[in-house]
Each structure stands twice: as C-alpha cells, then as structure tokens.
Amino acid sequence: MRHFVFVILCSCFLAACSTPMAPQDISTASARWASLVKQDANLYRIDDKLYRSEQPVAEDGELIEQLGIRSVINLRFFDRNDNETHLKGRNLMLLNRPLLTWKIKPKDVAQTLFLIEKQQKYGPVLVHCYHGADRTGLISGMY
C-alpha cells in the first residue's frame, strides 16, 4: 500500500512538472519591458531613467538630447572614442565603461550598474555597445 501511494505521488509530481505553462501574450510581455524609440538605432526606452541602443551616430544626437538624456555610457572595449566623434558639441556627459564581451565578471556588471545609478542623478542615461545586443542586453537585463 505504501509503495502504491508513493508511485501515485511521484506520478502526480511528474505530471505537474511536465505541464506546459500557459502561453504569454507577447504584446503584454513587451509592454512591460522596453519600448521602441528608433528602430534603425536599436534605441529603446527601458524606463524614465534608462535607454539602450547600438553605437549612436551623429544623426542620433538631436533625438538623444530631445529625450532628455544627459549621460551616454559606452560599453565598447574597442573603438571607444566613437562617442566623441559622433556626439561632440552636444550637451552630454560621454563616459566609457568598457566590457570585454567574452570575459564579463559580476564585479564589472555591478560597477556598471553603479555608474548608471550615479549618472541618473543628472538625468536619463543611454547605455550602448556596438550593436546594442550582448553587453547592452546584459546590463539592461540586470538593471
């Protein structure tokens, strides 16, 4: 009898573990996350204080200022001076926080999040890498 009860309990447990979750409506999931601002710049608004994008180009400078962004944090390890090239003369704080894509440590993530929080005292922050995918996605997700 005890063996029978054990088998029934195990069967119920396994059935519960294998039951698929209800599909989530993609539109409501994305509405809770980031909202697209400019597709060709891979620019998204995470919240009132954080934006994410790929490497900004000169044409993005005006929009960045219109959004009230005050700080631009570059996560790129190579070609770190592109912000100065594309965004010079703008009323923006340009900061470098290089992350080596294949060697990011928890300490690097924590320091980057601290820098974002510190810069948000001056206004919204834009964080980016080259494509706005891996490094930017990691930092945005941890934020």
Predicted regions and their residues:
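Positively charged n-region of N-terminal signal peptides that target proteins for export
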Residues: 1-4
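Hydrophobic helical h-region of N-terminal Sec-dependent signal peptides
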Residues: 6-14
